[in-house]
From Swiss-Prot:
GO biological process: 'de novo' AMP biosynthetic process; IMP metabolic process
Main function: Plays an important role in the de novo pathway of purine nucleotide biosynthesis. Catalyzes the first committed step in the biosynthesis of AMP from IMP.
UniProt organism field: Methanothermobacter thermautotrophicus (strain ATCC 29096 / DSM 1053 / JCM 10044 / NBRC 100330 / Delta H) (Methanobacterium thermoautotrophicum)
Reaction(s) catalysed by this chain's protein: IMP + L-aspartate + GTP = N(6)-(1,2-dicarboxyethyl)-AMP + GDP + phosphate + 2 H(+)
Residues the record marks as active site: 13 (proton acceptor), 43 (proton donor)
GO cellular component, one term: cytoplasm
Protein's recorded name: Adenylosuccinate synthetase
Cofactor(s) in the UniProt record: Mg(2+)
InterPro entries per record: Adenylosuccin_syn_GTP-bd, Adenylosuccinate_synth_dom1, Adenylosuccinate_synth_dom2, Adenylosuccinate_synth_dom3, Adenylosuccinate_synthetase, P-loop_NTPase
C-alpha cells in the first residue's frame, strides 16, 4: 500500500500532467483522486498521440482500471464536469468517476462576480472561473453543495470512505494537486495567489486522507519557471530573452502568455520544506537543454544537466527521482528504484 501526493512546486504549469500520466501508467494505482481548488487550473495530458486539456477530471484517467474521485475540498462547476465526462467517453470515465457529495458548487453568479471584478481580473489576474467567489460563499456557509445538484446525482459518493477503505485493503492511492506552491493562499506571493492553500497537506485533506497515511510527496518543478498573471517573479526574464531561448508558453485555461524566468533554488527549497517533499520531478529539461531531448538514461544526460540536477538536490535536500525530457511517456528518466 502506498499513498502518494503530487503537487506543483512553482506557480503552476510545472508539467504535473505529464508526471501524473507517467506515474499512473506505470504504477497503476487503484484510486486517482483530484485535490486542489477547482476548474481554475488546467492539466495538459498527452497519451498515445492524443492531447487533452482537463480542469476537473483526474489526469490519470487513461488508466482504465482506476477509480477516479474528486475530493470534497474541490470546487465543482457542473457544466465543466459534465462536459469532461462526455469529452473523455473513449475511456469510460463517466462510469468510473465519483464526486464527493460535500463539494461546493460554482454557479453562474460566481463566474460573473469573478469576471466583473477589476481587482480580481486585472490586479490579481484571476482566471475568471468563479473559484474565489465560490470559496468565499463556502467560508460564509452559504454555498450550494454537490448533493443539491440533480445532474450530479449519479456521480455522488463519499470520497474519504472510498480512499481510506482502499488504503486499509492495501491498495495504492494517488492524489493529484493542482496549481502550485507559489499560489498558496497562505505561503504564496499574497495577494497574487489563489483562493486556498495548495500544499500537499491540504491536498491530502481535500480528499479526506490524514497526514499519517501519506507515504510519498512528489514536488514537480519545471527546469525553468513560468507564471500566468500578476505578482512578484524574482527570476523573471524578458519576453525577448525567453524567445531567444525558444521558451514561449500559453496557459491551458486562460490562453494568456506565461511569464518566463530562470529556476529559483530558494523557492524550490521553501516549497520542498513546506510540502514535506520526499521526491522531486523535474520537467521540460529538453526545452532548456535541447541536447537532452528524448534522453531516457541518466548516464546519457549532459554534464550541465547533471550539475543542474545535483544543484537542486543540494539546495532542497530532496532526491530528484523523475526527469522528463520530452512530451511522450517514454521520454522519462525514472530513478526511483535507484534512489529510494
Amino acid at each position: 500500500m502506498t499513498c502518494t501526493v503530487l503537487v506543483g512546486g512553482g506557480w503552476g504549469d510545472e508539467g504535473k500532467g505529464k508526471c501524473i500520466t507517467y506515474l499512473c501508467y506505470n504504477d497503476k494505482p487503484s484510486i486517482i483522486a483530484r485535490a486542489g481548488v477547482g476548474p481554475n487550473a488546467g492539466h495538459s495530458v498527452e497519451f498515445r498521440g492524443d492531447k487533452y486539456g482537463l480542469r476537473l477530471t483526474p489526469s490519470g484517467f487513461f488508466h482504465e482500471d482506476a477509480r477516479l474521485l474528486i475530493g470534497a475540498g474541490v470546487l465543482v462547476d457542473p457544466e465543466v464536469f459534465l462536459h469532461e465526462m462526455e469529452y473523455l467517453s473513449k475511456y469510460s470515465v463517466a462510469d468510473r468517476t465519483g464526486v464527493d457529495y460535500r463539494c461546493a458548487i460554482i454557479e453562474r453568479k460566481h463566474k460573473e462576480q469573478d469576471q466583473s471584478s477589476s481587482y480580481l481580473s486585472k490586479k490579481i489576474g484571476s482566471t475568471g472561473t468563479g473559484c474565489g467567489p465560490a470559496n468565499a460563499e463556502r467560508v460564509m456557509r452559504t454555498a450550494k453543495l454537490a448533493r443539491e445538484v440533480e445532474e450530479l446525482g449519479d456521480f455522488l459518493t463519499d470520497v474519504p470512505l472510498e480512499v481510506n477503505e482502499a488504503l486499509d485493503e492495501g491498495e495504492d492511492v494517488f492524489v493529484e494537486g493542482s496549481q502550485g506552491f507559489g499560489l498558496s493562499l497562505y505561503y504564496g506571493t499574497y495577494p497574487y495567489v489563489t483562493s486556498k492553500d495548495t500544499t500537499a497537506s491540504t491536498a491530502a485533506a481535500d480528499v479526506g486522507i490524514g497526514p499519517t497515511r501519506v507515504d510519498e510527496v512528489i514536488a514537480v518543478f519545471k527546469s525553468y519557471i513560468t507564471r500566468v498573471g500578476e505578482g512578484p517573479f524574482p527570476t523573471e526574464i524578458s519576453q525577448e530573452e525567453a524567445e531567444e531561448m525558444g521558451l514561449e508558453e500559453y496557459g491551458t485555461v486562460t490562453g494568456r502568455r506565461r511569464r518566463i524566468g530562470l529556476f529559483d533554488m530558494e523557492m524550490a527549497r521553501e516549497s520542498c520544506m513546506i510540502n514535506g517533499a520526499t521526491q522531486i520531478a523535474v520537467t521540460c529539461v529538453d526545452r532548456l537543454y535541447p541536447e537532452c531531448e528524448r534522453v531516457r538514461e541518466y548516464s546519457d544526460l549532459s554534464a550541465e544537466v547533471k550539475r543542474f540536477i545535483e544543484d537542486i538536490e543540494s539546495a532542497t535536500g530532496v532526491p530528484v527521482t523523475i526527469i522528463s525530457t520530452g512530451p511522450s511517456l517514454e521520454d522519462t528518466i525514472d530513478l526511483r528504484d535507484e534512489l529510494l
